[in-house]
Amino acid sequence: MLHDVDYVLRKLDWLRAEGIWPNGLRYLWTDAFGVVLYVSLYTETGEERWLGAADRLVADVERVLGRRRGLRIGEAADRDGQYFHYLAMWLFALARLGDLKPKYRKRGIALARDIHPAFVIPGRGVIWKMQEDLSGPYPGYGLGSMDAYDGYVSYRMLGEDALAVEIAQMRDLMERDWRTLDIEQDLGLGMMLWLAHFFPDEPWAEAQKRRSLRTLETMWVDPPGYFSRAPWLGDTKFAFTNYGVSLGLQAAGIWPGRVDRLNAFFEDWRSGDEYDREAITWVMACTSHLPGAFLTRGGEGSTERDEPRERSSAGPVVDGSASRRKGRG
């Protein structure tokens, strides 16, 4: 596991000076990674300023993206709707910050209870993208392929007892799915490795780790040192998705040389498009160099009990013919 705090501090100074992050547009996925990064920096340095930065970031995300239920995908006009896997990553961030400040764990539990009935169809799946008010699926979007795994892990990080019903529903969806699930894109493979490392002895995690590593092996391109977008797209590469693979590999404790190779390659490589200056690229680069609080510390899963719940009404039912989405990023 890398601990390159100096790299992260230099990159954060540059991001702020350029008005990219955290003083740019809000984007839920990036900001979730950012909250965990701040927790990692606090853990590494012991400096209270990083907890203050996390407090301010959470407050700004809730102010800008928060809705009556859930959080919008991003601040930009074309980032409407709500993604479940973005929300799940935000829940994970609240759990990690909640390890240090319990109010955030309570906030995460409340958010999970609020959004779960809208996205989850028990026994069927998790809707990948919903309309912004959670009134129904976003047009053209069906069931996600990894979303139950996202929710399962984040819910367990927040509270095993407080979210027992929701965890059981996610576990049931996974049990129906893990034997046949084949992930084919780089970021999804990296994130599955990351998800699996929290509960490595569970059958789904053992199987998906093996399968993900086998697929990633076919996607490694060296020279120069990167993972392609998919096995059949050897020339297609994205920096931020490779950084997600790096997180997964460090979670799995495998291929450290490849982690170093891809970090070195993407530090200098430029795509020539907007991603060269997108916050998602460089916040995830920081995570690749300092995974820290993203990784298990043993004894994961909170048993904290919360106040009696107020259940939301059940969400909409999606036509069973809706496609299952495998892509990420």
Where are these regions (language model features)?
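Glycan-recognition and catalytic cores of secretory/periplasmic carbohydrate-active enzymes
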Residues: 1-329
